Amino acid sequence: MKKYLVGGAVRDGLLNMPIKEKDWVVVESTPEEMIKLGYKPVGKSFPVFLHPKSHEEHALARTERKNGYGYKGFKLYTSSKITLEEDLKRRDLTINAIAKDKNGNLIDPYGGIKDLYEKKLKHISNSFKEDPLRVLRTARFAAYLFHLNFFIDSKTLKIMSEMIDELFFIPVERIWLETKKALLCRNPHVYFKVLLKCGALKKIFPEIENLFHIKSFYNKNINLGSLTLRALYESSLISNEIKIRFSMLCHNFDKFNSNNKKNSFYCNKINGNLILNKICKRLKLSNEIKKLSKIALDHHDTLYKIFFISAKMVIKFLNDINAWKNPKIIDDLIIISKSYGISIGYKKKSMHKQEKFIKNLYKKLNSIKTKDIIKDGFIGINIKKELMKRRENIIYNDFIIYK
């Protein structure tokens, strides 16, 4: 029995990046021997075991052969006679097919170290095209390693573009898992740029791809898709929360192509929300993500109008986003609005003024408590009326705002 460290741990170690987890390949062994040595079997489709002490995954060397469609259309073979090189060959990219033995020696049969040095994401063989999930994985690695100037090899990108029809066979759960990982990268926008470039975006995220066919109102030479990805990037500089980053992808869903020569698009919140509901339902997203995405769609530009709307509209806005019971929504919306603003050309300094304004406004309005109104003798429907009146008075007396 011999075991080798493989995959991301070797790759990230060579790149001096943090190692998140360690995976091992075991050759010249059998399931019976692994169990006898105390390893716990956990794999359903193929023999994977947990180390009795470290609990790190150890997989018996295996090969695979295409026998169907999609990323599950494979027949797996495992045997004590399968070599390390044969196991590494079934992997997606050369940089993920480097192994390390117990003495620290590197085994690199497919040139992964050279490609790491050249910052290249390159497929190992033509068998790459047999698994459509690799389109998403390669796009994710492009996002993950973008800060190190990695790029996708042109031949690999060409193969990816030839695989897009099989994306249909990937379960939505796997699509969301890869997308979620990509959204948590330092440069999440790169993932969607790669999917756009190889034609996959239209297949799995048609709602986002459609934005690339709508010209911006602010700059006719830029489309809304590009602005959306720019906003996503800006949000990633401020927050690492998945709900905020995904919301940035949805904030332009209410924009549609216009036949009017003066305006490149028109807004329709109702249809925009229908599109949002469709993508959230398809991806089976959490209520938390859905709620913030809806707020981003409906109110991402409200902070830019805050100086020019009436007191009643300000209070309605805060009611709509449920700010009284969920104060954090103000901070989330500020991040969304700032990211949107920067994407369309606002300066950060001017947005700081609006951020300070809305925070101070909310703090004062939220200081009015229903219990104090009841103490003053108001009952029934008059409590709500008095609450509204007092909040309006604060806006009129303490803040410069339209009546």
Curated annotation (Swiss-Prot):
Q: Which UniProt keywords apply?
A: ATP-binding, Magnesium, Metal-binding, Nucleotide-binding, Nucleotidyltransferase, RNA repair, RNA-binding, Transferase, tRNA processing
Instruction: Please identify the protein, giving its name as recorded.
Output: CCA-adding enzyme
Q: Does the keyword Transcription apply?
A: no
User: Could you tell me which Pfam families the record lists for this protein?
Assistant: PolyA_pol, PolyA_pol_RNAbd
Question: Which cystines does this chain contain?
Answer: none
User: What are the GO MF terms of this UniProt record?
Assistant: ATP binding; CCA tRNA nucleotidyltransferase activity; magnesium ion binding; tRNA binding
Family to which the UniProt record says this protein belongs: Belongs to the tRNA nucleotidyltransferase/poly(A) polymerase family. Bacterial CCA-adding enzyme type 2 subfamily.
HAMAP family reported for this sequence: CCA_bact_type2
State the function annotated in the UniProt record.
Catalyzes the addition and repair of the essential 3'-terminal CCA sequence in tRNAs without using a nucleic acid template. Adds these three nucleotides in the order of C, C, and A to the tRNA nucleotide-73, using CTP and ATP as substrates and producing inorganic pyrophosphate. tRNA 3'-terminal CCA addition is required both for tRNA processing and repair. Also involved in tRNA surveillance by mediating tandem CCA addition to generate a CCACCA at the 3' terminus of unstable tRNAs. While stable tRNAs receive only 3'-terminal CCA, unstable tRNAs are marked with CCACCA and rapidly degraded.
Which residues bind CTP per the record? 8, 11, 91, 137, 140
Further facts? A single active site specifically recognizes both ATP and CTP and is responsible for their addition.
Question: What are the names of the required cofactors?
Answer: Mg(2+)
Where, by residue number, does ATP bind?
8, 11, 91, 137, 140
Annotated membrane-spanning segments are: none
